[in-house]
Amino acid sequence: MKTTKHIAALLAALVLALSLTACGQTAAKDDPMNPAIPVADGAEIGEGSKTFTTEVADQDGKAVTFTVHTDEKTVGDALQKLHVVAGEASSYGLYVKTVNGVTVDYDTDGKYWAFYVDGEYAATGVDSTDITAGATYTFKAE
């Protein structure tokens, strides 16, 4: 009888442990605030009829360039959907804090992600910039 109770208790503990494990965190790719693995230099990502180039230059001077294919309307929508950029929504639009796996935050390190369109400082934010096929969109940690 004691053995049966011990086996039942052990099985109950095992079932409980397995059910708690199944309730763990979701993968990074499912969290738009946590970009997935960085895109490699020269890669092509996404699917769609619009194509543009993205350049990322981090605070250490490392730069990568990759091609994005999408059907989204704005650069921000495309890059968020592909988990390349993440940030915080504000009254001014998306405050980009993470690009291609690298986080810079003006509040903590005095740097921010500057956004450029074809080499010129952008007049609009990434989430307000409509995609122009063939354009180059650049993020620089400044």
Model regions and ranges:
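Ubiquitin-like/PB1-type beta-grasp interaction modules and other compact soluble beta-rich domains
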Residues: 2-12, 18-142
